[in-house]
Structure formats: C-alpha cells, structure tokens
Amino acid sequence: MPSASLIKEFEQLVGKENVFSSEADRQSYAYDAAVLKPMIPSLVVRPTEVEQLGQVVKRCYEEGIPMTVRGSGTNLTGGTIPDCSDTIVILTTGLNKILEINTEDLYATVQPGVITAKFAAAVAAKGLFYPPDPGSMSVSTIGGNVAESSGGLRGLKYGTTKDYVMGMEVFANTGDLVKTGSRTVKCATGYNIAPLLVGSEGTLAVTSKVTLKLIPPPKASKAMMALFKDMDGASQAVAGIIAAHVVPCTLEFLDHASINYIEDYVKIGLPRDAGAMLLIEVDGHPAQVEDEAVIVEKVLRDNSATEIVVARDAVEKRSEERRVGKECRSRWS
C-alpha cells in the first residue's frame, strides 16, 4: 500500500472521490474480461484533467511504484490486470471529452476515456463515419481501443483502430509529455511513434489525447446470413467472394461449436444443426451494393449454401450482426 502521505497527495490532486483505497474498491480493478488470475492493486486513481494524469504518472515514477493503465477493462488479453500487488491502477475513464470533430479535414481529437459507441454516434451526427467497431464498443473506451488495436466486424474492409490513429499525446513513464503524429494526411516529420504505441497495451506510455481519421459514410449497404453443412463449404465461399473482387465490410465466420455455444448463452434463434455460418455485409454506392450482393449470393450458392437470409432493413442488419458477432468474440476470443 502506498504511504498515507502519497495517498493524501493524490486525493488533493484529483479529489478524494477519485482515489479508491478500500479493499472492496481495489478488488473491482483486480481483473478484466480475460479469464486470468486477478491481482488486487494497492491503489486506484482516476484523474479528470490531463495535467492531473501527468502528475500521477510522474509521482508513481518518482516513488518507484508500478503503474497499470485501465479504461473500461473490456479487453480479453489481461492487459489491465496489475502485475503485482504494489501496482497503482490509473483509470482514464475520467478523461472523457470529445475535443474536436473536424468535418472539413476529416479528423477528430478525443481524450482516452471517451466511450467508443458515443464517439461513433457523435461522428455520425456530423455526417461522417468512424469504422472500427469492437464488440464491446458500447462500453469500451477509445484509449483502450488504441491500447489493444481493437477491431470488429468491419475490419476486413475498413481495418482496425491502428488504421485510424493519426496522432497521439502520451505521458512517458517519467511523466513527460510526448507528442507524435499530426492532423495531416502526410506527415514525415520526426519519428513515427504512434504505430508503436497502438497495440502496446499501455506498457510504453499513458495516452492523454488521440487524433483519429474519419471518412465519409457509405451511402447504402446490404447484409445477409448464409448457412452451410460444413466448414469447408463456408471456407470456400469466403475464398470465392474475395476472388470475385468483392471486399465485404463484414465477413464473420462461425463454426458449429460457436453457433451452439452462442445459442446456449443468448438464445437468439441460431440454427443448431448448421455446420457453419457466414455473416456478410457489403456497402458503398447503391448500384455497387446491388451488384456486389448479387455476386456474393451467387458465390454462396455455388459453394452449397443451404440457406441464405437477407436482412430486411438496416435495424435488423446491425442488430443481428452485433449480437452474433459480439457473442462469438466474447465466447472464443
């Protein structure tokens, strides 16, 4: 446990309500979504201002105290589980402001505690699109997405978080502020540090600000579900779709075991006798979407799909994709 004087210092810095020292509070931050051995930290501190974050990091460094950075803790890698009982957990959920959405230059700047789904919705309200859609996006944070290089159903066509990070501001373990990247499409100035930080699970620096690329949204989309007797047919269908030069924005594969585990867990009406299932979505210009949907359906039938179901509308499409995709990853990731 940190000294009483250090705890008091943190309470004065971030407010007593943002320092958690009781055993019950600390136990809540001993684990994350990964099924790994928990470790109770010595203290949990939640800064609400960037300057506070830098000071907390600096004081931990000066006192020789290990740090673990945490957002919502939805990761499946154990990245937010403390390494030892002396660790102080630094919560970034208090830094949750969307600082800018630039509709002219197509970027946004946010703090690490911003919830992914709220950010995507704010961007959509401005007529733009932020594609990365991890299954936990309703509760995950942008900082956590960057730390894990998170991706989701749209990853095949649109990529993952790493493809949208333009720049970052982070605190080194000493508490020094480091700025990397820029808000321009082309930036060859200085070392390209941001790609090293993305996916580092908070082991290299503590994120205080992220600049993310935005794109125009697709004008139309169409989603479908295809069932197969076995995995071979589904695998061949995937290869056939790509070989036909169609890159779906969603292409999710479930084998027989996954289908049944998910159905046991959430009971959403998945066909238990199916050997494999594909969730597919194409998007883009309306004419392109119709053409690609026809090609995809033909490839599916040519590879012995036993059933093809096309979503009736956008609400049904996203609801089914999100439920199935989220449960698939949560059970098997």
Model-predicted regions and their roles:
Residues 1-326, 331:
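Noncatalytic alpha-helical scaffold of FAD-dependent oxidoreductases
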